[in-house]
């Protein structure tokens, strides 16, 4: 085999170690080159202004007001709708700082649906959203304790209850009401808290599933505003905490915030 080496040519016997080395070097070099091109083209898409800095904190707590926290979420969702690439701080330094403690600015009660990823919807990064998830975004003892922990111990200024378009748990609750459907295992018990919202939404005009999802959100918001422990109620009375509802449109990516106070 004849191989060009710079300006000269070498005759290498077939199967020789030198030939294997040459092939390996060529293949590895090609792979590295392709990787470099891919990496450079990928990172070229990340404009400096797209890198999202973590929300401000002081003494291990968020310094944002409830309205400032909500404004960050609204801004992030608008960027998501515009297909803007927003890169949060994922550096080793950021990870190391979070190992010492977290200071989220929002507690999120949302559905377990895989199509509803809060950090992506709002362009936020590590340690910024304290997320409580279950099918149907309901609040049982475990969820309530998690929310109260986020408020009392972590000092979040905002709690958002997020329902979404075409929620399977709400559809299941509707089938119980309309068809007396039954589900195996613990699913029946899981959707039971959603049934009152389905019943209340039946008389509302418009899409019955969307109405039921929003009514379910409103019921949870009402509980968190009025029927929870003083550790939740006191910061709301002192305007250090807000609890609001939201609805996510799967098809467009838009999040509508409602029942604001």
Positions of predicted regions on the chain:
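Gly/Ser/Thr-rich loops at beta-strand to alpha-helix junctions
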Residues: 114-115, 164-169
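Twin-arginine (Tat) signal peptide motif
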Residues: 19-27, 41
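Short hydrophobic alpha-helical membrane-anchoring segments
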Residues: 37, 41-45
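Active-site cofactor/substrate anionic-group-binding motifs, chiefly glycine-
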Residues: 112-137, 142
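Glycine-rich, flexible N-terminal cofactor/catalytic loop recognition
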Residues: 93-106, 111-116
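N-terminal secretory signal peptides
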Residues: 1-21
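Divalent-metal-activated hydrolytic enzyme cores
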Residues: 27-34, 46-101, 126-127, 136-145, ...
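Short beta-strand segments
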Residues: 109-111, 133, 160-164, 244-249
